[in-house]
Amino acid sequence: MSDMKVNFSSKIIDSTPSEEEVATQQDSYTKSGLVAPSLDSQALKKAPRKRVIKENIAALHTSSLERVHQKKVLVQNLAQLQRGLAKINGRVELEELIDGFSVKELLIKRNPKIAEEYGEGNPLMIRSLRFSNPQEVTSKLGAEGKTPAKREVDTICNKSTLHDIVMTPASLVKKEVRMNLISEVPRAKDKQKYRGLPSVVYGQSSRRSESDYLTSRNGFGDVHSLKSNNAFNSDYEKICGSLSHAEKLGLIERNLTPFIRHDPDRISTDFVHSIEELAEHQMLLQSRKPASALRHNEYCTKLELWDAKAIAVGESRALAVATLIEFNLEMLSIAQEIDDDGHKSKMVADFIERQLSWLGPQTALDSKSTLERVSAVTIQEREFIANEISRSLRQGVSLCTYDKDEAGSHIREMSLLDFRVEEIIEGISIFISSKLLHVTNAGEA
C-alpha cells in the first residue's frame, strides 16, 4: 500500500478556477478513483434547489455507502432483537424470535462439517484473537478503535496497516494431539493480550474447485511457536517491495531459521512445508510426551477470510456471541463488496497474484513471472474465483468448542440456541456497545 500525502499551500492566487483547471481537476478525480462533484457552482444557481439536492444525494449512493447503510440497519435490528429477547422463555420461542429478524444470518449458523472433518483426522488451523496491547484488556471492548474480532478481519484482509500482511501465523490442531491454545497459556499481567479470548478456526474447503490453486495455502511451520516478527528486519524492508508474495515468504523463512528452538524430542531440525507434514510431526511429538498437552505450534502462511469456519468459544460465552455477530457481519459485507466489484475486485486480484506466485508448494516465482501468469487469467476465470470467494464468505462462521481429553482433542459444533438467553442478550450488548464512541482517560483530560 502507498501513503496518500496531501500538501497544503497558504498562498491563494485566484479563487475562481478556469475552464482548463476545472477539466484538469475532473481528470484528477477520475484517475484517483474519487467521486467528482457532479454540478458546478453556475449549475447550482440555475437549477431548482430541491432537484439539485436529490441529484447530489443520488450521486453519492455508491456501493460502498450502501454497504455501510446495510451494516447500520443490521445493527439496529440487533438492538430490536435484544429488547425482544428479554421476554423469551425457552429454546423454541428463541428460535422463532430470531427467525423473524433479518439478522438471523448473523446468528444462526451451523457448520457440522468442521466437527466431522476434524473427527475424521483432517487438521485445522486456529488463531486466538488478541487485544492490541495488554493495557486494552482493562478498557471497554472497542475503546481502542477496534474489537479483537474487527482487528482479526482487517489483518486477514490486509486492511489494517500500511505494510503488506505476508503471513498470518496460526497453530495447527489435530484430533490425535492435545494442544494448548495461545489464549489458554498462563501469562504475566503485562502479556495477557490473548488471555481468555475466543479463537478463529480456519480450514481448507473440502469442495474441489475447478482451479486447484484456490485451495492451497503454502507456507512453513514449526512444532513450537516462534517470534515471527524477527523475520521483518531491515534487510527484509529494503528488498520486499520488489519481491513476489512467494519470494517474501521464502525470505521470511530464511530470516526465521536461526530462531528454531532446540528440543531433543523434535523430529526435524528444519521447518516443514505443508500442514500435513506438520501434523505428522505434532503426532510424533505427542507420542513422546503422552502425558502432556503440547504448547502451541506455529505455521506461517497467508490465511484468507473465507478460510474462517468457526469461532471457538473462550472463557466468556457472551464475548463469543459478540464475536460471532461481528465476524458474520464483516464477512457478509466483504462478500457484497466482491459482488459489487466483480472480477475487478482488488481483494480478488491480490489473492490471484499471491496464489500464482507459487509453482508448487516450495517453488517461488519472481514478480515478473508471477505477473505473466496473472495476465493469462481470463475474465471468466476471475469471475469464477470472485463468485467462489463470495459464496464461501456468505457461509459465515458458526460456534464451536476446542476440547482436550486423554485420547486427544475434539472440535464440537455449537449453535447460538445452545446458549442461555441471558448470554445472548449480553453478547449483543457487547457487540453494540463496541460500536459506540468510548471516551478514554486521555479524552477526559
Curated annotation (Swiss-Prot):
This is Uncharacterized 50 kDa avirulence protein in avrBs1 region. InterPro entries: Pathogen_avirulence. It comes from the Bacteria. It comes from Xanthomonas euvesicatoria. This is one of the putative proteins coded by the open reading frames within the region required for AvrBs1 activity. Keywords: Plasmid, Virulence.
